[in-house]
Design a protein with these regions (language model features):
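Extreme N-terminal signal-anchor transmembrane helix of membrane signaling/transducer proteins, especially
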Residues: 4-26
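Membrane-proximal low-complexity regions enriched in glycine and acidic/polar residues
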Residues: 40-112, 116-118
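N-terminal membrane-insertion alpha helix
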Residues: 21-38
Length: 192
């Protein structure tokens, strides 16, 4: 084989493998974005169901405006404009998150309009040995009866749902390294 032909094969092979690796990394990033949106939608639907259940059995109706505000990727506020019990809220949150397959730790707090502060915060962990007690939630203006939910492990939960993509990317990196090693070995032996 001539040197020019070998160089062409080496360059084409490297370009192809690097192109596949870049495409894989872009797909992994897009998969993360999609998982993040799916998680947000599941949380939104679950919190809306919790708000509806808190209104059941009362004389008040669920407001027509959206009661859920997404403050950040892992922090949601639900305005219910209705008095509710903390134990009932916790039960509804657990059951709705379980229905939606949201299997990550969360913490919540509810606003007490009498003391004008967030109270009764609780950390709900799927791992029973993990008991966090310090929960801080800021107070929000213009809301009277509301609760807040935070998912402290959202990012690790999303990464764990993308294990397949990371394994595939790692395998492609290994293939690239084997290819480079093979080319270096061929060039060192000068069998071309």
């Amino acid at each position: 084989m001539k040197i020019n032909r070998l160089n062409t094969i080496i360059i084409l092979g490297l370009v192809a493998i690097i192109g596949i690796l870049i495409a894989q990394l872009l797909w992994t990033r897009q998969a993360y974005t999609i998982e993040e949106k799916k998680f947000s939608q599941k949380v939104y639907v679950s919190l809306l169901e919790v708000a509806k259940k808190l209104y059941e059995g009362t004389n008040n109706e669920l407001p027509s405006e959206n009661p859920i505000q997404k403050v950040s990727n892992d922090y949601y506020i639900v305005n219910v404009n209705n008095d509710f019990d903390a134990e009932v809220l916790e039960f509804y949150l657990k059951s709705e998150f379980e229905k939606a397959s949201i299997k990550t730790d969360f913490e919540y707090a509810m606003y007490n309009c009498q003391s004008d502060e967030m109270v009764y915060g609780n950390y709900i962990s799927l791992d029973k040995s993990n008991n966090k007690t310090s929960v801080f939630f800021p107070k929000h203006k213009n809301l009277v009866y509301y609760f807040a939910v935070r998912f402290p492990n959202e990012r690790s939960f999303l990464f764990s749902s993308l294990k397949f993509w990371f394994i595939l990317s790692f395998a492609l990196i290994i293939i690239l390294l084997v290819y480079v090693y093979s080319i270096v070995t061929i060039l060192q032996q000068k069998k071309y």
